[in-house]
Amino acid sequence: MYFCKRIKKKGMTEKENTTLWSENVIVVDAEYVDRVAFNLIVNFERMLGRKIPAADMARWCDCLVLDGGIPSDHPEGIVSVVLIHEKDSAAFENFVPASYGELNGKAFKDHLGEFVFSAVAVEHLTTKDDLLLDVAQSVVESKEVKRLMVVPNSEDGDCYDLLRQMLRRAPDDKRITLFAMQPMPGGNFHQEILGYSLMQALGIRAAELEDPPPSPSL
């Protein structure tokens, strides 16, 4: 899959090109999902007895939107992917492509639509959780958006609980999906297990899990 610089729409200002939401939006806590990917790599390399490559970003995004309700036989146009990361962090360690600078403003296109990436660094006056909540709320309030998929840090802090509270007021015509590594308290949204999409992106096949290689004898 090739990532290329996205061409801005003619007749639109710089602000309009960068602030309008598409019908489908993915919002991600970048360091959190990178940490989860690392843990999966370590565990499955031990279990399967083979090297696990870095997660394929394009493949992961495809799996997210399928879990988020986009039909595989009905492409939905543009998908905005917002990667929220700490200011002192320059890249993923367990995804390819990895660099936030290289991903920002880039896009790839496949049978599910055009995925347009924005990498947003957290400034000193806010926190990553607060920024993610602000972005998610902006998306929910946007009339253009039909589907929102959020990957928050559901293991540390109260970001997940604050999202639950905020989404109580979400319009019924939006499909909202939160991703976590285990079932979490529900609300006005769908839930999906984050590990399934990451396993696909890491190239871990279901058949391998059904018949893993024997552990080496001591």
Where are the model-predicted features located?
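Nuclease catalytic cores that cleave nucleic-acid phosphodiester bonds
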Residues: 110-218
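Short, flexible coil/linker elements and helix-boundary hinge sites characteristic
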Residues: 2-5, 49, 65-68, 143, ...
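A signal for specific C-terminal beta-sheet/loop modules enriched in small/flexible residues
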Residues: 1, 47-53, 177-182
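Domain-level signal for Mg2+-assisted phosphodiester chemistry and nucleotide/NA-binding surfaces
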Residues: 6, 11-120
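Long, compositionally biased intrinsically disordered regions
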Residues: 3-18, 204-218
